[in-house]
Amino acid sequence: MKVTYHGHSVIQVETKTHNIIFDPFLTGNSLTNLKPEEVKADVILLTHGHNDHVGDTEQIAKQNDALVIAPNELAVYLGFKGLKVHPMHIGGARQFDFGKVKLTQAFHGSAVTDEENKTITYTGMPAGILLTIDGKTIFHAGDTALFSDMKLIGELNHIDLAFLPIGDNFTMGPEDAKLAAEWLRAKQVVPVHYNTFPVIEQDPDAFAESLPGGVGKVMAAGETIELA
């Protein structure tokens, strides 16, 4: 299984039979050269409705006839746009043909902002996503603050790879993310949601080096790792 980081919070997971992408914010993402029209995906997983996470979902979903899995209100909102959606909610899990998806809580917001019309559309609660696929469990925390139930998530799940935001200001920063990594007990932890904009500038290497046991891993935008 191949896992690729495309900057910000964009993660792509490729197996022999499926291609899954998390939070496909490509247009406006200064850290990647990947274009929406280049993306091949049959599943799109969304953590919440902010524009820097929903990103190019509509284009990618329509050109690939991809299934969009998202928190309920966001899924319904995208369904109104003609996308094929599957709504879920926090605490809920479902087995799909590609693997198992479970939504966890995240402490953040969730809304689609239309700057041209000066409107904000509420899209339910934000979430983290546990994806169990090909015998491995990947945790995408979404945008979130540190919260103590991360301990429970770590106790209940054997997480092989966790993606944690470190940008601060809108999410937890490096210090809180370090504690989150400890609580989640993932075998490998990759920082995300940093350096896309000046307000979330961080040193990912310093964060990774601060994690005990060598579990920290910085992925450059476009880098792929094998998860076997």
Curated annotation (Swiss-Prot):
InterPro entries: Metallo-B-lactamas, RibonucZ/Hydroxyglut_hydro, UPF0173. Coiled coil: none annotated. The keyword Metal-binding does not apply. GO terms for molecular function: hydrolase activity. Keywords: Hydrolase. Pfam families: Lactamase_B_2. The keyword Hydrolase applies. Belongs to the UPF0173 family. This is UPF0173 metal-dependent hydrolase RBAM_026340. It comes from Bacillus velezensis (strain DSM 23117 / BGSC 10A6 / LMG 26770 / FZB42).
